[in-house]
Amino acid sequence: MNNRVHQGHLARKRFGQNFLNDRFVIDSIVSAINPQKGQAMVEIGPGLAALTEPVGERLDKLTVIELDRDLAARLQTHPFLGPKLTIYQQDAMTMNFGELSAQLGQPLRVFGNLPYNISTPLMFHLFSYTDAIADMHFMLQKEVVNRLVAGPNSKAYGRLSVMAQYYCQVIPVLGVPPSAFTPPPKVDSAVVRLVPHATMPYPVKDIRVLSRITTEAFNQRRKTIRNSLGNLFSVETLTEMGIDPAMRAENISVAQYCQMANYLSENAPLKES
């Protein structure tokens, strides 16, 4: 038997398709999302509707974004969901969530079992729309969730941790084994809740500067910041900010990265591209 076939659909590797089929896990996720009528619920990658059906049962309207043409067509003719759905057959990476929020007249509640092959770039895409998003609930590779929630002085802490925590409060919800999917992925999964900050705890003047600093620091994470960020900051400047130049990228807090970004914005701003 081909374990890539589920409900008559052949899972496509190029779309990173693994279909959720564990009822306990599905119920736990829907309970964590707690969808309510009248909310602007948006699902990314509904697939074979494992989450779409129980969420849709509680709603009058649901927006879904599905890249796979066959799956989008199945949803359109779904016996009870079809009339409730607004279906965008496109890549979520090309979706303007700000425009979608404006259309729906309120901040979005976004959820989904994200394809693991695009989960990190998709997270960065969504971060750029956090002013249009109320919250997000995603199934991700467990290793990615560990990175999202990691704090300084840990191996999992990296650029994704800093940028996610800059924009959102990040809360792990539950772990999910490979056996909950068809076909089973080779890795463990986990569900995470991301709630955009109502007030930024460490606002930066130019997000591009924070992005640049974290990229340069974590691309050379074994080096001290005296070396990895030496082209941006002198030892004296770091010391004045109360940041030890002998620290590595993984030792620096989100607040300190934001402090460095604001110093650079004031003293050596990026040119407009």
From Swiss-Prot:
Catalytic activity: adenosine(1518)/adenosine(1519) in 16S rRNA + 4 S-adenosyl-L-methionine = N(6)-dimethyladenosine(1518)/N(6)-dimethyladenosine(1519) in 16S rRNA + 4 S-adenosyl-L-homocysteine + 4 H(+)
Keywords: Cytoplasm, Methyltransferase, RNA-binding, rRNA processing, S-adenosyl-L-methionine, Transferase
EC number: 2.1.1.182
Identification of the protein by name: Ribosomal RNA small subunit methyltransferase A
GO cellular component, one term: cytosol
Keyword Iron: no
The family this protein is said to belong to: Belongs to the class I-like SAM-binding methyltransferase superfamily. rRNA adenine N(6)-methyltransferase family. RsmA subfamily.
NCBIfam families for the chain: ksgA (TIGR00755)
Family matches, as Gene3D superfamilies: Ribosomal RNA adenine dimethylase-like, domain 2 (1.10.8.100), Vaccinia Virus protein VP39 (3.40.50.150)
Primary localization: cytoplasm
GO terms for MF: 16S rRNA (adenine(1518)-N(6)/adenine(1519)-N(6))-dimethyltransferase activity; RNA binding
Function: Specifically dimethylates two adjacent adenosines (A1518 and A1519) in the loop of a conserved hairpin near the 3'-end of 16S rRNA in the 30S particle. May play a critical role in biogenesis of 30S subunits.
Pfam families linked: RrnaAD
PROSITE patterns named among the record's database cross-references: RRNA_A_DIMETH (PS01131), SAM_RNA_A_N6_MT (PS51689)
Residues holding S-adenosyl-L-methionine: N18, L20, G45, E66, D91, N113
InterPro entries to which the protein is assigned, alphabetical: KsgA/Erm, rRNA_Ade_diMease-like_C, rRNA_Ade_Mease_Trfase_CS, rRNA_Ade_methylase_Trfase_N, rRNA_adenine_dimethylase, SAM-dependent_MTases_sf
